[in-house]
Curated annotation (Swiss-Prot):
Species for this entry: Lacticaseibacillus paracasei (strain ATCC 334 / BCRC 17002 / CCUG 31169 / CIP 107868 / KCTC 3260 / NRRL B-441) (Lactobacillus paracasei)
InterPro entries reported for this sequence: AAA+_ATPase, AAA_lid_4, DNA_helicase_Holl-junc_RuvB, P-loop_NTPase, RuvB-like_N, RuvB_C, WH-like_DNA-bd_sf, WH_DNA-bd_sf
Binding site for Mg(2+): 72
Single GO MF annotation: ATP hydrolysis activity
Function recorded in the entry: The RuvA-RuvB-RuvC complex processes Holliday junction (HJ) DNA during genetic recombination and DNA repair, while the RuvA-RuvB complex plays an important role in the rescue of blocked DNA replication forks via replication fork reversal (RFR). RuvA specifically binds to HJ cruciform DNA, conferring on it an open structure. The RuvB hexamer acts as an ATP-dependent pump, pulling dsDNA into and through the RuvAB complex. RuvB forms 2 homohexamers on either side of HJ DNA bound by 1 or 2 RuvA tetramers; 4 subunits per hexamer contact DNA at a time.
The family this protein is said to belong to: Belongs to the RuvB family.
Gene: ruvB
Region (Head domain (RuvB-H)): 261-338
PANTHER family assigned: HOLLIDAY JUNCTION BRANCH MIGRATION COMPLEX SUBUNIT RUVB, PTHR42848
Protein name as catalogued: Holliday junction branch migration complex subunit RuvB
Keywords carried by this UniProt record: ATP-binding, Cytoplasm, DNA damage, DNA recombination, DNA repair, DNA-binding, Hydrolase, Nucleotide-binding
Region annotated Large ATPase domain (RuvB-L), chain positions: 4-187
Length: 338
């Protein structure tokens, strides 16, 4: 992932450890406090209740969708609802089988192991997970050379929760071992507005309903973006001595931050303008777009495209990406003129 993307206000990624700490303070602890994702919440409530009634560990859970939609938060909520401990890590952090063994060895019956970016697990680690997930054991090779021999190591029943922004990169054997698979969708403006108001209360910040809704409307359907914009708007409001924050203050702050009426920032607009100006809207190959706006192809696919596709400003074709008539109109142009 390009480091530059983490500096974007409208990026779904966590930009630094300070933001991670702030996110932690804003997180709900139980499903009843978790705003949005109603379908996912309802199904998880059923699965969790059933597992508790049977006194069994919850089936393994895969959460997938764009960054910033609350996958990590939901994993923590699941552990709280189950009343068990949770160990959190990420795919890149588990570099070798010994790292996985150390994590599994710390689990007690019913505990949750959460692996973020699970699509980035090394292949040798992923293969060790198969027996751990399916039959709750791992085989460890002890010794070296002629004396090396496998040792059967039983594990307590546990729940693996994997999170990914790239579900298509998961191997079929790993994906098939998740009994519960839930897609995290973009949030509605109404749900995001409730999140903004809840966060404002935690920040001890007054904001009116119109102001909260305007932040929600420009937050790209993403709670992390909504909270990040709220923090920056709070700065502008405090310097201006304005309380409560109203829609005029929100408009002023977001104009200064170059976040437009649809939640696009200067990089989104640069991407669209390049395609319109140099290729009459496309089709344009992903590698060409990446080279001209100075980003990696994976960053464009994961960070920029999903929202532009979601709001209908961009479409994918077999020959490349194309700007839609709505995308032309947003940039103040007509597709018929190109």
């Amino acid at each position: 992932m390009a480091d530059a993307d983490k500096d974007r206000l409208v990026s779904g990624d966590v930009d630094d450890s300070n933001e991670a700490q702030i996110e932690k303070s804003l997180r709900p602890r139980m499903l009843a406090q978790y705003i949005g994702q109603d379908r996912v919440k309802h199904q998880l409530e059923v699965y969790i209740t059933a597992a508790k009634q049977r006194e069994e560990s919850l089936d393994h859970v895969l959460l997938y969708g764009p960054p910033g939609l609350g996958k990590t938060t939901l994993a923590l909520v699941i552990a709280n609802e189950l009343g068990v401990n949770i160990r959190t890590t990420s795919g890149p952090a588990i570099e070798k089988p010994g790292d996985l063994v150390a994590l599994l060895n710390e689990l007690h019956p019913g505990d949750v192991l959460f692996i973020d970016e699970i699509h980035r697990l090394p292949k040798i680690v992923e293969e060790m997970l198969y027996s751990a997930m399916e039959d709750f054991y791992i085989d460890i090779v002890v010794g070296q050379g002629p004396t090396a021999h496998p040792v059967h190591f039983p594990l307590p029943p546990f729940t693996l929760i994997g999170a990914t922004t790239r579900a298509g990169m998961l191997s079929a054997p790993l994906r098939d071992r998740f009994g519960i698979s839930e897609h995290m969708a973009y949030y509605s403006a109404d749900d995001l507005s409730e999140i903004v108001k809840r966060s404002a209360t935690i920040f001890d910040m007054a904001i009116d309903a119109e102001g909260a809704h305007e932040i929600a409307r420009r937050s790209r359907g993403t709670p992390r973006v909504a909270n990040r914009l709220l923090k920056r708007i709070r700065d502008f409001a405090e310097v201006a001595g304005q309380s409560p924050v109203d829609i005029q203050m929100v408009d002023h702050a977001l104009d200064q931050l170059q976040v437009d009426q649809q939640g696009l920032d200067q990089i989104d607009r640069k991407l669209l303008m390049f395609m319109i100006r140099d290729y009459e809207g496309g089709p344009v190959g992903l590698s060409t777009i990446a080279a001209n706006i100075g980003e990696e192809m994976a960053t464009i696919e994961e960070m920029y495209e999903p929202y532009l596709l979601q709001i209908g400003y961009l479409k994918r074709t077999p020959r490349g990406r194309m700007v839609t008539p709505a995308g032309f109109a947003h940039m103040g142009m007509s597709a018929e003129q190109h």
